[in-house]
């Protein structure tokens, strides 16, 4: 049990700290202050003292009340302090006393003023109901004193003490009936009511006695001490009797305090019953009961709130939230997690479970994002709306079509004379300007023959220019396949045939170099038949014309065959529509900016047109034809150089004229986004398997390159050729590839990434060279693609790890062993093969099994240290950190040589 402090006990007894300390001093309990701690025995002693005072005060008050009822005036209290006020009892009038004889009654008894015949104490009623037999016995022989008390007459001292002992002090006061009270109708009703009241009083007395007998325990004071808090008197309070007040019989209802009742187990139930029986009265509950009631109310309130909250939560949790998202393109991990209602960590965890290492800002392509969202419980809708990037190619009505010049592509193997043949047709010298006599990019020209135009496209024949050759085949109507009569069919010849067949382009074969003595056109025809090109004279449909670019023999026949093939194909186009065509080549001119060579296929391109070329937009500011002259319009099948683009387009992009610049900008922006998504999708993903492979194989070495070329096609060709050189050990990493001169920005990029700058047909400025020297960046300039490939191969070979090879130096047989102090075991050996060198690598072989691999620590010949011992000589050999050598072992000396590898 917890200790009690003085101020807590004073608060419980409702007295001041000073009065309590004085009282405890009179009782022999000395304390220093109100914070002093009291023992349990001291607390019980103080409570019993105050309880005796309250009991005496209650008895004195009962004397005063009885005297007041008789009209004798207040009784002096003789200095006894008042007991604390009990709960205020509502006024109830006592019924008029009966004389006991029915004959003396006038046939009606007096009713109480309130008109209620029920007993005031419900608690007593319940006791009476539980003990009907006892109540019946008591009803038969009720004493006269009890009847007198019930009639409102005062009790003498002996009777008062007996009433208190029987527990009747708690009976609520009864008032005299009013003088003007009405009589009850029927004497039997009045007698019945009086009889019931007597029975209840006798039952109450017996129940009180039983309770007093059963509650005689030591902790009685502690059990009802808290109840007495409400009943404790305030210090210095005077009673009305002491103040000289007199209370008449017809005044306010009396307040008779209850004496301390015996605390029983059913005390709270009795109090609840009493409070329920008197709805107008204030319950005289103890502090503990009030606290318990408050706790119960709070607990009920919390339970109701939790119950309501649980219902609300249950109502909220019932519909399962399913996120429905619409995906139109790539999306970052963080944005995807936000849209499907998950955290970024959950999405990353799922991706790692699928073997994809992702970060919070990494973008996922459309397919991956849709798969992740579906697996994480979201409903995914892929918006398949037609993107703005696609421009429909309008179908022209037949009446609007006009005949147009054919577009002819000259294709073939390198050095078979394509450019020379085209030069002979144009009667201009173009080959001399090409580096090494090799065409580096597509050239577009127009030739007039018999008042008709023919547009020629010259494609490179080198293997690195496959993409450019494929674009030339896609943009052409007729393909001229040039085959040298002395060389025959070569690899690029076969590739050109495949490109033309894939594009569905008719092929005209030009067998060139027939002027040479070793020329054999028949052999060429025979070889071409193996690839499905059968000459007309052999029953096929392929036109083959022998020509000579040097002597110009057969050139007119070749052009006539081209026009004949064009007539058969009926090439037509509508010149009165917005222009549409293909980008042949693009380059960056220092004075004019981005310049694109475009071939108009439909419509007419005019100055001021807004066009979109791939992911680039612009407004046509100027157009230059193949002769270098400015033109205002370009009809179908006309190649022109266009100025006014925002950036360099890719070779092979489709261009189309649109209504205004705003639409062109929107389309270009959308295409740039699509291009970025495709690059993201095509990029190699870092998976766990890749990480394990890299960890097992070691770090992959990279050769970083920055490529700058004169035209876009050359840069693409270099990129494709160099990327093919990558191996599992050395990778070519192209950091940047652009068109134009080498700039300081390129030097800064190369310096930061330790890259080499390769310039193809471009030259750096003086300040760029100086910046490269200061930064330690190497710039290599080339004009022929062969040299670039060879030099890059050599550089990659230098990055390869050298190959290690083991070289056996010699073998020695152990014939004796010696234990040398501080040196361990030394083997006496005889060199049987080669030589044994000091500090060489060695292994000990015992019965064909290697038992040690290490290094020779010492080598001696007699007592002298030697560098090596040749075959046929004896020596002493000491091995490093190995002493378990035995006779008969073989010591094998060897070394490791590194051999440089090549690609």
From Swiss-Prot:
Residues 139-152, 178-195 have a biased composition (Low complexity). Keywords: Cytoplasm, GTP-binding, Initiation factor, Nucleotide-binding, Protein biosynthesis. Residues 412-419 are annotated as: G1. It is found in: Cytoplasm. Residues 437-441 are annotated as: G2. It comes from the Bacteria. GTP binds at residues 412-419, 458-462, 512-515. GO terms for cellular component: cytosol. PROSITE patterns: G_TR_2, IF2. Residues 458-461 are annotated as: G3. The keyword DNA-binding does not apply. Residues 246-255 have a biased composition (Basic residues). Residues 512-515 are annotated as: G4. Residues 403-572 form the tr-type G domain. Its main location: cytoplasm. Residues 121-132, 204-231, 263-276, 285-296 have a biased composition (Basic and acidic residues). Residues 66-296 are annotated as: Disordered. Residues 548-550 are annotated as: G5. It holds the Pfam family IF-2. GO terms for molecular function: GTP binding; GTPase activity; translation initiation factor activity. HAMAP family: IF_2_B. One of the essential components for the initiation of protein synthesis. Protects formylmethionyl-tRNA from spontaneous hydrolysis and promotes its binding to the 30S ribosomal subunits. Also involved in the hydrolysis of GTP during the formation of the 70S ribosomal complex. Belongs to the TRAFAC class translation factor GTPase superfamily. Classic translation factor GTPase family. IF-2 subfamily. This is Translation initiation factor IF-2. It comes from Moorella thermoacetica (strain ATCC 39073 / JCM 9320).
